[in-house]
Amino acid sequence: MNKHDLRLELLLKRKALDKAKKLEADLEIQSRLLLTKEYRECDKVLVYVSNDIEIDTKGIINAAFANKKKVAVPVTNDDFSLSFYYINSLRELKEGKFKILEPVNRDNKVDDFENSICVVPALCCDLSGNRIGYGKGCYDRFLSEYTGVKICLV
């Protein structure tokens, strides 16, 4: 099966998930991430703001706030590159491109990724860290330059 067909199949499976089972799985995945050494030891969490079919990240974001970590979420630029901006609350977000929640305030751009983790959306990945995302290549471009810890949520 080629990458395009696999992506379509996985999207259909995600959309067909029972809401209660998805919520249970999301909470388990969030809990596992929050228990990792990488999360506990980082100062900054770069994290996507989830939509309905992605692994929910709002619990991760709120936990990071509670754990006094800096939280940054992405903005998709016109060239499909990503820029991350610090937020202090989920209330600082509004719907942007692709109907994705993005920070309203663009004054606090992240320019130092030291001691950070990046929580990455994915449809699937292998044990070597190769992932299939949602097809625009935004994270692929960012991750090719990012030297911190990358954690895929699938």
Name each region found by the language model:
Residues 5, 12-15, 113-118, 127-131, ...:
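Surface-exposed, charge/polar-rich loops and edge strands
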Residues 47, 120-121:
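Redox-cofactor binding/interface segments in oxidoreductases and associated redox assembly factors
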Residues 61, 133-138:
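Charged helix-capping and loop-helix junction motifs
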Residues 51-53, 123-127:
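Short glycine-rich anion-binding loops that position phosphate/pyrophosphate groups of nucleotides
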Residues 1-113:
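N-terminal active-site beta-alpha-beta segment that forms phosphate/nucleotide-binding
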Residues 101-103, 121-124:
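A structured binding-face within diverse protein domains that lines the active/interaction site
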